[in-house]
Structure formats: C-alpha cells, structure tokens
Amino acid sequence: MSLRVGMAVLAGAVLVFGAAMAHAQVKTTNQGITDTEIVIGTHQDLSGPIKTWGVSVANGMKMATEEVNAAGGINGRKIRLIIEDSGYDPKRAVLDTQKLIEKDQVFSMIGAMGSPTVLAAQDIVLDAGVTQLFPLTAAQFTFKLDPAKPQDRLKFNNLPPYIESTRAAMKYMVELKHPKKPCIMFQDDEYGKNVLDGFMQQLAAMKVEPGTQTSYKRGATDFSAQIARMKADGCDLVLLGTVIRETIGAMTEAKKLGWTVDFLGATPTNVIEVPLLGKDVVEGLYAAGGIEIPYEDTAKGKVKDWLVNYKKLFGTEPNTQAIIGYDAIETFAFYADMAGKDLTGAKLLAALESGKEYHSMFGAPPAKFSPTNHLASTAIQVQQVQNGRWKVLQEGLEY
C-alpha cells in the first residue's frame, strides 16, 4: 500500500469514527439544575490508604467551589458540592455513586478518586446520563471512546494518562541512563496495569528487553520480597507504579539492603508528601508529572496567593492533589459557563467538545477536547527530588 493511500485510509477511518461518535444518540440528564444552583458530586478516599490524596483533593474542590460562588456562581447559579467517602473501596464507591445520582440528583460527577473505585462506578454514572469529569485516575477507561457505546461521550479526563506518561518518562530515562535491565513494581489494579502497559510498550518500541515485573496488592505495606527479588535479578532501573506510602516503603527497603538503583515513579508519586515524608530515603527519585510543583517561598503572583489562602483555609500545606481538585472544579465552571444560562446536559457536552481551551493558572498544558478526543493533553514533565524538593528536569515530553 502506498503512503498516500495509507494516509487516505487512516483519514477516512478517523472521519468515520468521528461521525459515529457525533451522531450517536447520547442520553444526558438535566437533574441537579435549578434556577439558583447546580448540584455536583464526588467520592474521595477520606479514610483509607490514599486519604493523603483524597482529603487534599476534596479541600481543593471546596476552595474552588467557594471562590466560584463568591464571584456570583455560574450564570447566576451557585455550585452545591456533595462529597462522599469511599475509603478507596470499590463497593463503597458504587454505593456512594448510587446515592449521589439517585438521592442527591447530581448533575455531574467531578474529580472522583481512584482507578478501581472509578471503574466500579463508571457505568452507573454514564448510564444515568451524568457527565463523569476529570476523575483522579488517568487510566484509559476514563477517556477512551468506543463508537459502539454512545454514553462514553460523557467521560472526560484532564490528567496525563498513565500509559502515555509512563512511556514518555521511560523514554527519557532509557535515553539518559541506558539501563540493561529495567524492572517494574506495580499496584495490582487498573492503575498499576496501565503503568505496566506503558512500561512494556515503550521498552518494545526502543528494543530494550524488560527485566523483572513484580506486583503488590492494593493497601500492602511490606515490599521486602519485591525489592529483594529485583536486587537479586540485577535490575538497574526500577519503575514504580505506586502511590505515596508504597513509594517510600519500596525505597526504604532498597536502602536497608544497601541497594543503590535509579527509581522512576509514575505520575501519582509526583506529590509533595513523597519527599516530605520520605526525606533522605527518596532523594534522587525521578517521576513523571503534569505540572511544576509550587512552593510558597518561590511561587509568585496568583499561584503564591493561592498557596497562602489554602493554608489559611485548611491549616495545612497545599499540595499537588489540592491543585488537581481545585482545577477540576474550575474547569467544570469554565465549560458550564460557556454552555450558557439555559444549562442542560446536552449543552454542557457541546461546550466540552467545542475545542475551546481552559488554561490553568498552575501552568498545566491547556485542556482541550473534541467529539473524538476526551483527553486534555498527553504532554508531561520528568521531575526529580533534589534537596527535598521536586525539580523539573524536562517538560513537554511525549513518546
């Protein structure tokens, strides 16, 4: 097949896909909208193994909601945000979602937490015609569109996707370090499997043989067996498909064994708490990230004001998780405002798919969606812990 013919076939396939998605009948809901308010909901881990993420995300969402409402709301309507605690338990997330949709009558589900918890409840959200916006998981199921499933058009994500971000970060590290035996330790769930996919795909693309692949159960606290195995196998680069405490735990075990090896974390490791709690143990850790992590003593302008105000409101240091929660509400408000005074589910969907860009004050890549693309961006950074702080090494990376 000639290149010209091949490109024509590809273009035709894209057009067919776009037409199928655009013309499929999508059920949308108008529940939760009154003359005075818009009801939105979320489920977070406020009491479970990743509550360090959940509490901060919830705080960021509350802060943005208060600011939007103080400025007059969205075309005169105030946001009413309802937050439920899933404890990072898929069964509880399902119950929370049913309550939010059936009892509270939420218009949108925004910023829901975690791959296994979001996955367990996603069909409930979409089947009800409720938009699922900007969940705290970058797994493919949160943005990948299936033309045979019209309700897929109700899901959007604005985080760097796990597979693509892992591939970009691995490409950077392989070119930087030239490892002979790159290995991976990952959480045994949708998140970890996406990171594993990115790891395997990028090594295959670069013709590098993968080393040990070892997993752990969600909620685990002992990683001695995994670390000992990778050390014995001669791994010279370790990708961590972990969150916060697992990252610190894995690197602590490596230090106990006197094992000096380069660690690269997937995007959920790129948070302030890792160097704050891990201290010297995590010094030198690399990670894929979406935004430069701001620090109060070096931040400027609106970002510095935001950091100061967050600390006043919640009595705790701001972090990346809070920024993500804040931006989830701000992004929703941007597109809901664009949808106009006569807000409906269909008009919100049209606004989201319009191609208009939302720009975060925190410097994340612009969020932009279309009828055939419900992922805001795939560009990432690679950062490293240096002297107890995350430092950007390279930005605008893609594989």
PLM regions: where:
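Beta-alpha junction/loop-to-helix N-cap segments that form part of ligand/metal-binding clefts
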Residues: 26-28, 37-39, 52-59, 67-145, ...
